[in-house]
Amino acid sequence: MPFGSARDEFLNSAPHFATSEVRERAVHSPASDNPMKLDRIYTRSGDDGRTSLGDGARLPKFHVRVAAYGSIDEANSVIGIALLHVEDAAVRDVLTHVQNDLFDLGGDLCRPEREHRKVEPLRVSERQVRWIEERIDLFNAALAPLESFVLPGGTPAAAHMHHARTVIRRAERYMTEIAYQEPVNPAALRYANRLSDLLFVLARYVNEQGRADVLWRPGLHRA
């Protein structure tokens, strides 16, 4: 990939490094095969309680948009923990694929929908949504039908995937709140929604390989 294209893609898609100072250094860094090389992690630009979006706009760190892509980053980290406990190669491949897509999703949210951009920002695509749906269908077909709601737990891998699922649900709620105020990429919203479903299915899948799901028993402790 030419450096210019890779550099623009980086600037459009890295919410965790999108301070104005880092963007400035990335823009003026020399051409290389790795345009994301950063020689310094802290920038002091967030010391006033604000952070920069991918387009340079400044927002308070408690803003719902920052909370949304922060939750996506959190979910990605939880998936990383889940991967430490997953032995199935197919599940590992899916989770690693998702981790990369979550950077796309965070980058999408870090670049608000605007018109008349010089460079088209990186956006989550319908193809990525379809990929998630196909994996849901594939893994769900191998599972026994559900007889009750599932309690989060079972194997360590499943427990962490349930955790990631709930974090993604939180991110989706933040994204929906943003969408009531300003345009949000519809594919990004659908991706977040489908991803929580995929993580639920994968949690059940790894549980069936090691330990049965823990089912909810309504009113078990009422008497």
Which residue stretches match the model-derived regions?
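Phosphate/pyrophosphate-binding loop motifs in nucleotide- or prenyl diphosphate-using proteins
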Residues: 28-223
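Intrinsic disorder/low-complexity segments
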Residues: 1-33
